[in-house]
């Protein structure tokens, strides 16, 4: 996709809410090209609503929320439960072909391989997939759709670790603009260059990455340390479990991973995946 306008999103004097609950009160924001913005806060604080307002999917009560130049801003929106909207009668490979008809077929097949779909899945109807497989296919479909502005609402839900890492690498290599909602702090650490914290009708703008946000927010920093400690305990358990595997089991696991994700450097794959958007 071509470059977007310099101003990708603008919010002026925005006040918005539902019934008696006010989500935003006189909010002003500007998001520029190439920023990767994390939108964080408790459930129900208005993050998804803000995404819809900026895209024009919902009208504000007062004030303005809009994209920059709509002719130049090519938007791709990954919303929650997107996997549920996949056409169950269409095959796995055909789902990507319909999303990106100009993309070489071998490139689409390679992407499916990196998303752990071997050739036996290519003609399988989407309705036969598990919930996790549908989530991975929805992400693959998202990745092949050309865009220069990406809106992602909880994109890592139901993704396995390799798929999540591939998404992180692709987003870091992406030259366009990213707005991401996620409760996955480790994901946000990898991708964010700016943080918008939603809290009780206010949005605090941290013009730095997620580590910068933590350094300015004691409560969030303490919570992040607890989550990091829990993650280490889980990783230790996985290491112990893996050490108990037989040599044959380890060899089989290694072979399956190699088959699913192919060969080549991670950076090269990330650039190729990001290139589908750029």
What are these regions (language model features)?
Residues 3-278:
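ABC ATP-binding cassette signature C-motif
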């Amino acid at each position: 996709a071509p470059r977007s306008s310099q101003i990708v999103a603008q919010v002026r004097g925005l006040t918005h809410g539902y019934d008696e609950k006010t989500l935003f009160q006189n909010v002003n924001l500007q998001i520029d090209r190439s920023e990767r913005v994390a939108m964080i806060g408790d459930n129900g604080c208005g993050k998804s609503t803000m995404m819809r307002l900026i895209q024009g999917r919902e009208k504000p009560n007062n004030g303005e929320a809009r994209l920059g130049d709509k002719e130049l801003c090519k938007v791709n929106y990954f919303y929650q439960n997107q996997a549920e909207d996949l056409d169950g009668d269409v095959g796995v490979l055909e789902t990507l072909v319909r999303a990106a008809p100009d993309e070489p077929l071998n490139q689409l097949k390679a992407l499916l391989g990196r998303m752990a779909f071997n050739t036996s899945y290519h003609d399988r109807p989407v309705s036969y997939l598990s919930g996790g497989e549908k989530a991975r296919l929805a992400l693959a479909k998202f990745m092949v759709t050309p865009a220069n502005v990406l809106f992602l609402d909880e994109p890592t839900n139901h993704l396995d670790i390799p798929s999540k890492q591939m998404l992180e690498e692709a987003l870091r290599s992406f030259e366009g603009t990213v707005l991401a909602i996620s409760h996955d702090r480790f994901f946000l650490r990898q991708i964010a260059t700016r943080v918008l914290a939603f809290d009780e009708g206010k949005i605090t703008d941290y013009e730095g990455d997620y580590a910068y946000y933590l350094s300015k927010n004691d409560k969030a920093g303490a919570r992040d340390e607890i989550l990091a400690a829990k993650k280490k305990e889980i990783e230790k358990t996985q290491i112990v479990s893996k050490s108990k595997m037989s040599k044959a089991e380890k060899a089989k696991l290694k072979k399956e991973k190699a088959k699913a994700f192919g060969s080549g450097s991670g950076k090269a794959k990330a650039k190729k995946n990001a290139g589908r958007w750029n």
